[in-house]
């Protein structure tokens, strides 16, 4: 048993075994992280997911699960898809603004070059 139980084992009110699948990813000083993931996915499902993954990808998977769970708690209808949609909309607006600015630059350069040509004649 670990001297300090991980956030998952504290939340689940159980002993934290030496081979606890949660302890590397849910430290005792961040209980909200596990609570959010547990609320959305359930401890059993998260445990199964982590055990099916190679050790080197588990940390990234936990970060993704935490982000997605927090998004789902904050926005129960859309979750992280709402954020993705918002970001895509911002990208599209920025691309449109960039295209407009590039067109204005092209017009200004054309006028400038025509001014220089007429100055030489």
Swiss-Prot record:
This is LOB domain-containing protein 23. It comes from the Eukaryota. Pfam families: LOB. Residues 4-105 form the LOB domain. InterPro entries: LOB. Disulfide bonds: none annotated. It comes from Arabidopsis thaliana (Mouse-ear cress). The lineage of its organism: Eukaryota, Viridiplantae, Streptophyta, Embryophyta, Tracheophyta. Belongs to the LOB domain-containing protein family. The gene is LBD23.
């Amino acid at each position: 048993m670990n001297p300090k139980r991980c956030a998952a084992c504290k939340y689940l009110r159980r002993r934290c075994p030496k081979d606890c699948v949660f302890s590397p990813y849910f430290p005792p000083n961040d209980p909200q992280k596990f609570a959010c993931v547990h609320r959305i996915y359930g401890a059993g499902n998260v445990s199964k997911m982590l055990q099916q993954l190679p050790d080197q990808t588990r940390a990234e998977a936990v970060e993704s699960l935490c982000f997605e769970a927090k998004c789902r708690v904050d926005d129960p209808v859309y979750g992280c898809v709402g954020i993705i949609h918002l970001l895509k909309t911002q990208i599209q607006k920025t691309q449109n603004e960039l295209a407009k600015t590039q067109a204005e630059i092209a017009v200004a350069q054309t006028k400038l070059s025509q001014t220089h040509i007429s100055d030489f004649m």
